[in-house]
Amino acid sequence: MSARYPLLNRELGILGFNERVLAQAADPQVPLLERLRFICITSSNLDEFFEVRMAGLQEQIRDNPGALTPDGMSLQHAYDLVVERAQRLVHRQYTMLHETVLPALEQEGIYFHASDTWNDAQLEWARGYFLDELLPVLTPIGLDPAHPFPRVLNKSLNFVVELEGRDAFGRQAVMGIVQAPRALPRVVRMPQSLSGFEHGFVLLSSFMQRFVGELFPQLVVKSCNQFRITRNSELFVDEDEITNLRVALQGELPARHLGNAVRLEVSADTPAHIVRRLLDESSLGDKDCYRVAGSVNLVRLMQIPDLVDRPDLKFAPFVASIPPAIANAPTMFDAIDAGDILLHHPYESFQPVLELLQQAAKDPSVVAIKQTIYRTGTDSPLMDALMEAARNGKEVTVVVELLARFDEETNINWASQLEAVGAHVVYGVVGHKCHAKMMLIVRRVVEGGKATLRRYVHLGTGNYHPRTARLYTDFGLMTADQKICEDVHHVFQQLTGIGGELTLHELWQSPFTLHPRIIDSIRAEIDNARAGKRARIVAKMNALLEPSVIAALYEASQAGVKVDLIVRGVCALKPGVPGLSENITVRSIVGRFLEHHRIYYFHAGGAEEVYLSSADWMDRNLFRRVEVAFPIRARKLKRRVIAEGLSVCLGDNQSAWLMQSDGHYRRRRAGKTVRNAQLGLLAKFCS
């Protein structure tokens, strides 16, 4: 495929997205504390990138060094390019923090007190805090034959201490390790009376660098440097051998913290021989070491915007709106009976989704509730409603995806709580993550004097997660449409039972019909273009990687189909290549909210088919997951999806990045009229 149809590298594309995220921190139009937050988000994203993608690339090099990446590069060459770009990104990130953001914060009365700047009063306070709050929790480990180098946990904060002298047993002291327990605060507020700033903070590393000698009495501390090791965090569960997925997963979770090392981060001033020791102990090479000018974990600074009460330095708060069709209806069921309802988060509130489930839990007419859960958070009113429904005697069935990466433990806990109150809990289909977002409610109603069962459905592009519903852009559809409800019913039956492939009327479902329907729809546009008819494809998603879909889009471009792709993250397709993809544009929207909806638009000879989905156009979504795409039929709602989900992004000239044919992105510059998709929707919907 890559020989005939050129593809771009996935890992480089992911780093490119994080470069666009980091660019938000350099934008003076972004409030200052939000700029700090974007620096932290970049660090969090890079952590996952190393835990998953770089770990996988290293494994491939070890297991099959002669193999090629999908874009045709040798694994080692790809790895070298990714490392080089990651190093540049990290350097840019720390430079931006220290040369731009921190000085600007200081001007606003927000200051981080380094240990070498403390005056006598600050030093006395810091010593007292260390002795009272930190020292009792810390455990020094002196390295010698009886104390081997400890296996440090994934992404934990550690300090390597170079020592001189002999201890009480006469042993020559050379090196010690101090691991910082996760329970210790990484950022401590200094009293304002001592700080001299309205908001003064001290990092845990500053306490350690100044007072680590208290842990090694009568020895000379030659140096103290922080380091962090990132490990492979993929879980291995043998799907052919397991008899209980939850039990098997519970056994694997502790091992995540102790997987193979992937990356070493050290403070920039760490002596070379210390770095060599850390690399050797971690079985890492020189390329895997990242020397950073400051804290090795910037994610810990994510709490600063929450600790500082400065609304003028943050994004303006907003109140998400409630659609009149819901606000004016006696119940959610009455609102849905009156017609399909489209919710656009975060501009429209997620509360109606919660209310639908909460009302269903209490309504004596509701007999059954079925729900998929991928990510929902540790404190979820939605899960509380499901448990209340089960306690109230409803037939509650929940498909909990236990293998949702980094949410496995949370989902295991929810599954246990649901089972404890009598809900039916299933874990989907082994080998196929259930990523579809579906809720089905069965309610007994009286029509024409006769009792009958009516189904109500909610389908979404994003998770049933109230917190991220205020941070991610997503669409949700509430409907009582008979065909859609019947399709959802059958998908739930397939997930909970055993049966053959389904014949669905309205939904496209992976791993069965979703990919063929996408290809068929693209080919229909190709046929129309070749027949001289108008042809258009607009698709919005998080990632575009699947080779056969990319090949079909290239063919569409060559046939004259106008293709506009709005891909927030990684895109393997090359746009704008003469003779191949000159009719394709790719843009990425990066702003206050994480663009998350998946929208497929096909002109379809003027019929304008619009589908919403939980699926990106990636191999995993199309072939190894359970996903659904659902149509928007009501003309008014269809126009809304096109206008709010697609047109505003195509018109954005402030937060849009245009992809070039070499895979690099160029920020689209505003003309006389500034158009920002997210700000425009906030102004339209929110107060």
Swiss-Prot record:
The active site is at 435 (phosphohistidine intermediate). Mg(2+) binds at residues 375, 405. An intermediate of this reaction is the autophosphorylated ppk in which a phosphate is covalently linked to a histidine residue through a N-P bond. It catalyses: [phosphate](n) + ATP = [phosphate](n+1) + ADP. GO terms for biological process: polyphosphate biosynthetic process. Its cofactor is Mg(2+). ATP binds at residues 45, 472, 568, 596. Keywords: ATP-binding, Kinase, Magnesium, Metal-binding, Nucleotide-binding, Phosphoprotein, Transferase. One of its GO terms (molecular function) is polyphosphate kinase activity. PANTHER family: POLYPHOSPHATE KINASE (PTHR30218:SF0). Catalyzes the reversible transfer of the terminal phosphate of ATP to form a long-chain polyphosphate (polyP). Belongs to the polyphosphate kinase 1 (PPK1) family. This is Polyphosphate kinase. It comes from Burkholderia vietnamiensis (strain G4 / LMG 22486) (Burkholderia cepacia (strain R1808)).
